[in-house]
Amino acid sequence: MARYFMHLRDSIDELLDPEGQEFASMEELRKWVMFTVRDLLAADIRNGLIDFRYRIDAEDEAGAIVYTLAFKHALSIIPEPI
């Protein structure tokens, strides 16, 4: 199992994960990141504002980014027909 650190970032600010979390595979890591981003977006929806400026960067113990998910890529929006 490898330890990864999930950092929440936008172009200005960042919220760093000092503890990290262990994952058995990259697939498990990707699923966790997707679930987490969607959970954060669900909270945004409940508050009436969706903020797509953010992303989660997963870094390994050496500090290399191994996976990034921008919030805007975590869901699909189906617009109302005109």
Regions found by a protein language model. Give the residues of each.
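Short aromatic-glycine-(Arg/Gly/Cys) micro-motifs in beta-strand/loop hairpins
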Residues: M1-L16
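Charged, amphipathic alpha-helical segments
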Residues: R30-D44
